[in-house]
Every structure is written in C-alpha cells, then in structure tokens.
C-alpha cells in the first residue's frame, strides 16, 4: 500500500481570525480592567462569598485580606478548590468544604487545566483559572465563527 492521500486543511479565514481576536481581546480587556480595579487580588474573579464554606479555608490559604465581594459565592470557589487538588488526593478535606462533592467531582476539566498554574504559587493558581477562561473564550469563538 502506498501513502494515503489527505486533503489539505484550509487555514481559518480572515473573518474567523478577526472574530476570535475580537473575542479574546474583549475578554483580556475586561480582565485588565478588573485587575486594575482590584490590584493584587486575582481572587476577585473567583467570587468568594462571605457566608460560604469555602471562604474560611481560602483565608487560610490566600490570607486574611481575601477579597470577598459577595454574600453568597459563585461556582468559581469550587473550581478554585478543585484546581488546588484535581486528583482529589485530599478528598476528605474537600468533602467538608464542597457544597455538593459528587456534583463537583463530575466537573473536572476546567480545574485540571488550571491546576499546573499553581506551580507559580497560590496567586498563579488564581490567574490560571482566569487564563483557562480566556483560552476557552478563544476556542469557543473559533468554533462558533
């Protein structure tokens, strides 16, 4: 058998590239604005809540000056906790903090992709969650364009 012929893969059109760049540019612009409004507090993107189970642990890890913008936190809290331990090696701790551990354990792609950023420290882990979001916006825009 000889080599298999493959059809050439067309490069994305200029309009697709422009759309993706606009979407990613807008996302990065919003990240920059938020980072300027809350300098040194990337946890703002996580949206910890004052009445949640996550906040006391987050204050232990990230410091007492943790920015807590809401009464009730958002899903970012759970993703932050999962990104700290994506293999659930310390599952007993997570089970005491998670609002719904079985539900959260089914949603592992995002925190697993963000987890390596934690090699740069806790702040790196927080920025990793943001970076993965921006990358997802880029991919989603590409496939939708």
Name these PLM-found stretches.
Residues 9-13, 120-125, 129:
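Juxtamembrane/transmembrane-helix boundary motifs in multi-pass membrane proteins
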Residues 24-31, 90, 125-129:
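Charged, low-complexity, helix-prone segments enriched in Lys/Glu/Asp/Gln
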Residues 50-70, 78:
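Aromatic- and Gly/Pro-rich amphipathic surface segment
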């Amino acid at each position: 058998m000889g080599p298999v012929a493959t059809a050439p893969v067309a490069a994305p059109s200029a309009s697709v590239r422009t759309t993706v760049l606009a979407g990613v540019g807008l996302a990065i612009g919003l990240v920059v604005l938020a980072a300027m409004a809350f300098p040194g507090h990337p946890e703002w993107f996580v949206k910890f809540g004052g009445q949640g189970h996550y906040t006391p642990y987050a204050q232990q890890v990230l410091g007492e000056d943790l920015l807590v913008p809401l009464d009730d936190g958002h899903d970012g809290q759970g993703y932050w906790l999962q990104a700290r331990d994506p293999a659930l090696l310390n599952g007993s701790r997570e089970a005491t903090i998670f609002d719904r551990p079985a539900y959260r354990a089914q949603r592992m792609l995002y925190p697993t992709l963000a987890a390596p950023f934690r090699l740069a420290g806790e702040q790196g882990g927080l920025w990793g969650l943001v970076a993965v979001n921006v990358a997802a916006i880029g991919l989603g825009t590409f496939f939708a364009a």
